[in-house]
Amino acid sequence: MDEGNYDAVILAAAGLKRLGLQERIQSYISTCDSIPAAGQGVMAIETRIGDDETMEIIQFIHDEKVASCIMAERAFLEKVGGDCKVPAGIYAVPFLGHIEAVAFIGSPDGKEMYKRSLNGQTQDAERLGESLAEALIADGGGRILEELRK
């Protein structure tokens, strides 16, 4: 990094902080400017089926509001057929008892982008994600997704 053999570099602030290099952080990219992939920044723990003891130990880290947001994000991703090759993202956050979500579908070359935001109740998280996907598909994102599948 110090040799300067690049025009620009974007690194995770969390990683730089862990390395004790926080003084090198020049700026942060907001989620308004760069919508992350679904589930970014959320920790998930998988346990054995029926392992009640482990479930009891880890229950304190479960946050129902965050879980609802992830449900919305996963529903969006499933509806658009998202994987690591699909230029789509969604960011859902809990806010005053409901979920605020923003999502996009873009072309691989970055020339086209469809972006929408939507609010919904936490109990309707999956429907919120699906609705965002349906709206973006109708806006023109569906054509991009079809091209990617060819």
What are these regions (language model features)?
Residues 2-150:
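Small-molecule-sensing regulatory modules
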